[in-house]
Curated annotation (Swiss-Prot):
Organism: Schizosaccharomyces pombe (strain 972 / ATCC 24843) (Fission yeast)
Database matches in CDD domains: p23_NUDC_like (cd06467)
Pfam families: CS
Cystine connections: none
PANTHER family registered for this protein in UniProt: NUCLEAR MIGRATION PROTEIN NUDC, NUCLEAR MOVEMENT PROTEIN NUDC
GO biological process annotation, one example: cell division
InterPro entries per record: CS_dom, HSP20-like_chaperone, NudC_fam
One Gene Ontology MF term: unfolded protein binding
Listed name of the protein: Nuclear movement protein nudc
GO cellular component, one term: microtubule
Swiss-Prot/TrEMBL keywords: Cell cycle, Cell division, Cytoplasm, Cytoskeleton, Microtubule, Mitosis, Nucleus
Similarity annotation: Belongs to the nudC family.
Main location: cytoplasm
Length: 166
């Protein structure tokens, strides 16, 4: 989790290649009806209305989100957890809100993913690349086998320059 402490807000956030999760600690006993969470594809505004009205987090998002897949919930009446589904599931965010402290996305180590985690189009592309790579290895091995067989059948020929290519 990346911790962000600002004058007006304090939150923690983490991400995968597909989503961003934000955790904001709220006063114990906070219920969902005392919060106002406004999300759009590009902006986020979180306000608590009890005991007095206060904006907890507000501003333009680092990147666009899929609003229909993004959610929020209050956990144990003390944590607001916001789940943002990234529109582009192939890029890392350096921050949640533009202008807030950023992280070095070059140092992120992604978790291993499975083909089943990918969307249909990406999965098809990866499977095609894997098949082509496998076919290339098979073709190379066949060529090496044919050459080695030929060399065995013709020991009278000089293959000294060919050995480096096997």
């Amino acid at each position: 989790m990346h911790q962000v402490k600002l004058e007006e807000a304090e939150y923690e956030w983490d991400q995968t290649i597909a989503d961003v999760d934000i955790v904001i600690h709220v006063p114990k006993g906070t219920r969902a009806k005392s919060l106002q969470v406004d999300m759009s594809n590009h902006d986020l505004k979180i306000q608590i209305n009890v005991p007095e009205r206060k904006v907890l987090l507000s501003g333009p998002l680092e990147k666009q989100i899929n609003l229909d897949e993004s959610t929020w919930t209050v956990e144990e009446q003390e944590r607001l957890v916001i789940h943002l589904e990234k529109s582009n599931k192939m890029e890392w965010w350096s921050c949640v809100i533009k202008g807030h402290p950023s992280i070095d996305i070059g140092s992120i180590e992604p978790e291993n993913s499975k083909l089943s985690d990918l969307d249909e189009e990406t999965r098809a592309t990866v499977e095609k690349m894997m098949l082509e790579q496998s076919q290339k290895r098979t073709d190379e091995q066949k060529r090496k086998d044919v050459l080695q067989n030929f060399m065995k059948q013709h020991p009278e020929l000089d293959f000294s320059n060919v050995r480096d290519q096997i």
